[in-house]
């Protein structure tokens, strides 16, 4: 899109409060203070929630008069010169679509940031792994002496970076498909698309529509970092410098070397340019899928001028993120792994495929929750690598019907207790739900914490 003509903007409509919406208000307040001509601009905020997150701060910035506690109508959007939408807002709604048809600019916070920032930026998107990769790049960069910031769908809201007195040396953005829908000016040193699996099918009509939203990350990217195992998700043509990663070997790009370690066959090392740069046993992360995440992270580090050898030294110390294949207990020879962040089929498939080769015993999977319109038949081949399946939540029965002998239980607590009665030395219990959590929990963190507490209680009570 063309650059926003702030001097011609008299009326701004903000759709949605929350963390993003409040950061937009802070940004607009700052612009008003910097440019007296903007002091008279009318700003209205719409949010249909009775008590949306950030309401009190929004009142302090804007006052009560222009905080409107209802859903926006066509007359609201058509009255604006500029519409700023939070990521959760469906841009296919009639009041938004008709405003766009009337040539009213519709942007998100990332587009506002892109139009103003002159910082070096790399970005990550994908159905799964993007948070781990973002934090991994941030960790490595800081270990190598760079002042960097992680922002976007993780860390601080992007617009807050523009308000800081000291700007970082570089920015690492995690971007969701929702955020990318309204981005068109983001210039990146490198962009990575980790993977695509069916997700948010309650928002997108087709998988192709979801893929196209993800591919927008490459619009102005110099280096394109892409997954060799998912070439059907690559944008065509590839117009940037190509760097690939994958779970196979490659003579020039990043890849995996297979072999045998501790009696388990499979990938044992990360390679680059035909040489081993990192052994699997040097990492503190669980699962083969994390060896793939490391490859993408190293490629992004190269784009912000971090030497590969220095990056490899640093990444060995990265401990991973909570609720992502997190080992919460190794007790009596049984491993309990919290992968509550697995809110879609692809994430659960990655966890099972990544962890299965690392155990000598049986794999017991706990799955279920809110499926968000997913077709769970895509999980069928993954479930063939599972020995015992316990299901929970609203869509648990839909997963359970794919597995002979599965058992549906009422709660996660009951699932943990039942799992404890079934496992033996050498087994792993994996919570990887393939579903959202909001039928029984506040969020995936709440679900993961509940799993951890239930597991801890098992061994406290047996001590």
Curated annotation (Swiss-Prot):
Reactions catalysed, as given in the entry: UDP-N-acetyl-alpha-D-muramoyl-L-alanine + D-glutamate + ATP = UDP-N-acetyl-alpha-D-muramoyl-L-alanyl-D-glutamate + ADP + phosphate + H(+)
Pfam families per UniProt: Mur_ligase_C, Mur_ligase_M, MurD-like_N
Gene Ontology BP, a term: cell division
Involved pathway(s): Cell wall biogenesis; peptidoglycan biosynthesis
Places the protein is found: Cytoplasm
InterPro entries noted in UniProt: Mur-like_cat_sf, Mur_ligase_C, Mur_ligase_C_dom_sf, Mur_ligase_cen, MurD
Enzyme class: ligase
Lineage top rank: taxon: Bacteria
SUPFAM superfamilies for the chain: MurCD N-terminal domain (SSF51984), MurD-like peptide ligases, catalytic domain (SSF53623), MurD-like peptide ligases, peptide-binding domain (SSF53244)
Gene Ontology cellular-component annotations: cytoplasm
Bridged cysteine pairs (disulfide): none
Keywords: ATP-binding, Cell cycle, Cell division, Cell shape, Cell wall biogenesis/degradation, Cytoplasm, Ligase, Nucleotide-binding, Peptidoglycan synthesis
Entry's EC annotation: 6.3.2.9
UniProt main location, coarse: cytoplasm
Binding site for ATP: 126-132
HAMAP family according to UniProt: MurD (MF_00639)
Cited NCBIfam families: murD
Function: Cell wall formation. Catalyzes the addition of glutamate to the nucleotide precursor UDP-N-acetylmuramoyl-L-alanine (UMA).
Name of the featured protein: UDP-N-acetylmuramoylalanine--D-glutamate ligase
Lineage start: Bacteria, Pseudomonadati, Pseudomonadota, Gammaproteobacteria, Alteromonadales
